[in-house]
Amino acid sequence: HGTPLVITAHSLEPFRPWKREQLGGGYNLSSWAEKDAYEHADRVIAVSAGMREDILTAYPNLDPDKVVVVHNGITMSQFETPADDDPGWKVFERYDIDQNKPTLLFVGRITRQKGLPYLLQALHFVDPGIQIVLCAGAPDTPEIMEEVKTAFAKLDEERGNIIWIEEMLPKPELNALEHGCDAFICPSIYEPLGIVNLEAMACGLPVVASATGGIPEVVVDGETGYLVPVDQLHDGTGTPTNPDKFVHDMADAINRIMDDPEK
């Protein structure tokens, strides 16, 4: 009807084939709807340069001039250090998190793209004196939840010093948690930008993150954290071509950053 169509791209179905586990036949429908919408859009906004490349790879019929990059941002005032009497700090007591231990934090949904199973493998090679806090919930499927539970139980038995928070924390508690930890980990295998890294850095945390998607546009290797190199299959899954190397490189980066988080 002559009304311009503008799309902001935060993810792409062709690069998330694991969504079929969650959506079943609905994945075919969402893939068709996305392709049709993109190819008829007057403008497509990508949240990173990496995302722009993915869009043009997934939908080669798109006019590249119609695809522009506008990075996501955050509201810095939402990530200020809580006052000493802020009730958000109670999250440490409720989950028995020792604020005197060096602590690594993960925040994310339990989904293939967030790379949690790789992190749980990597933590076997991380200094056991480092306390690990996993804020991980909202699993895509029962199958991946069981996979994570099994890996967590094995890790907990082997090294301990790990806390798993399954509930989605209210913002004041999550903000306090991020301000009270020492470093942040983002092991994603698909991440168009990675707002969690912006939020962690806004709280003063150095970040260890996979060098995939838009993450290298957010985390400056050697300055605001460490990037973990990862070669990936080009079959849409993003699976690391050498999972063992990815896992060990991640563990090495975690140990380095936790050895000197102020660096």
Task: Go through each PLM region and give its residues.
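Short hydrophobic beta-strand element within catalytic cores of glycosyltransferases
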Residues: P206-A209, V219, Y226-L227
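Nucleotide-sugar donor phosphate/pyrophosphate-binding loop at the beta->alpha transition
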Residues: T3-P4, F15-D36, E53-L56
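Carbohydrate-associated surface elements
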Residues: G50, G73
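Aromatic "clamp/platform" in nucleotide-sugar-dependent glycosyltransferases that forms part
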Residues: I189
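A conserved mid-protein helix/loop that constitutes part of the nucleotide-sugar donor-binding site
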Residues: P102, F106, T111-F125
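A short helix/loop element that forms part of the nucleotide-sugar donor recognition site in Leloir-type
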Residues: E80-D96
